[in-house]
Amino acid sequence: MAEVLPFQGVRFNTDRITDPENVIAPPYDVIYQSDRITLEKQHPNNIVRLILSQPTDQDTDQDNQYTRAANSLRKWLQDGILLQDSKPCYYIYDQDFITPDGKNYTRRALVAVGKLHQFADRVILPHEKTLA
């Protein structure tokens, strides 16, 4: 059986970030290089800097896209750009959208921590193609 647990979420500090549309981005796996550059220029704290930091030819084990993203995360937390919730929580959110044929839908989601299992155990199933 899956273990589903609350966790201490991290979110943008709305006292510091007043225009959320400037710091959000699509999922990392659908962002083209040109879009990543545009998002980075939108705001110095755009989330793309954490989820899709750019590799360079000079990357090393000590300085690479992942260490730069980790350093940005630490700095944003230290500077109060991001805030961590004080206690573990489950997070529920709704996504409202209209389909191409004009129907209104709300997708409700639960965000939580799940214990990892071997894929073959089929405890947690992949999220890809769940509507097919």
Q: Locations of the language-model features?
A:
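A cross-family signal for N-terminal binding/gating loops and helix N-caps
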Residues: M1-L131
